[in-house]
Amino acid sequence: MLSDPIFILSVIGMSSCVIFWMKDTIKSSEEENFITRNISTVATLFGLMMLYSIFINAGDLGIILFIGSIIAFLVLIVGIVIGNPIIIQTSRGYFIPIFLIFVLRTFIYEPYQIPSGSMLPGLQKGDFLVVNKNSYGLKVNRTGVSSIIKNDPEYGDVVVFIPPHNPVPYVKRLIGKPGDSVRIINKQIFINGKAISREFVKTEKITITKRYRDSLGTISTRDMDVVVDLYFEEHGSKKYITRNIRGENIQYPSEWTIPSNHYFVMGDNRDNSNDSTKDVGFVPRDNFFGKADYLFMTWECWTCMPYFSRVGKIN
């Protein structure tokens, strides 16, 4: 994202707007040029460009907060040096909240909305999660080496990470660690030859939406009535519910050996999840940016009302 021309232009534009505002405030002139009269509109346009760059590049909003904090702090210093009370008051009003939000979001917690049903039945599409950013070490960017503390993911953690092939965050269940042998036989998972403990709960008939990709790469969807089996699964210190679709993904036993510094992840919706068994592959250690601790809201669509009946700690 930092090399995106749109992002670079928006940062330069926003900084220029701040400089023009400071210059106009210092002069205290009653004469206004075009830029002075329309500085709010111009700044808004550059702000929208910045948000657009974040959206198309799946960027981290924390970078914007960091840049905003630096700009507001520099303006505050300039205001103190020249003794201008308007600049001091205005820049302080921006710097304090932006910096506090940056620290909170970067080093403590970050909200994340689940975009798919890969973690059903426990977590569903539209759930907003609180991601603990320091679970696996402190760092400014979502990916990269932890700078201060380094704690490794544990079995059964609900992890949020950036897959190597796609800049969009994923949420999955951590199944295997570096060096582990993962084997799947009849949808039963074995780690280093030992089966992950599971207990049958019940069978349900549901309707699911399946995605299909044809030979030309076109993706289409189709609703299907299926029968699913629910299981209580216990892995590490976590106990959670998984879902298997009867008659889906029937295949020969599969086995993977996890390379050094990589992890194996799966969705709880075992037969309808893009994870380490399919296109995601092994996840590098540095690509984890947090553990999902809490569910604080569910908002299924823009025209739906959010609800809070499912709020609670994530297993």
Q: What residue spans do the PLM features occupy?
A:
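Soluble "head" domains of membrane/secretory-pathway proteins
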Residues: 1-29, 35, 71, 121-315
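Membrane-bilayer interface helices and TM-boundary transition segments
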Residues: 107-119, 133
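Membrane-embedded alpha-helical segments of integral membrane proteins
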Residues: 2-19, 31-81
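Perimembrane helix-loop junctions in membrane proteins
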Residues: 24-31, 79-83, 109, 113
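Internal/C-terminal transmembrane anchor helices
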Residues: 80-110
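Hydrophobic membrane-targeting signal helices
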Residues: 18-22, 77, 103-104, 108, ...
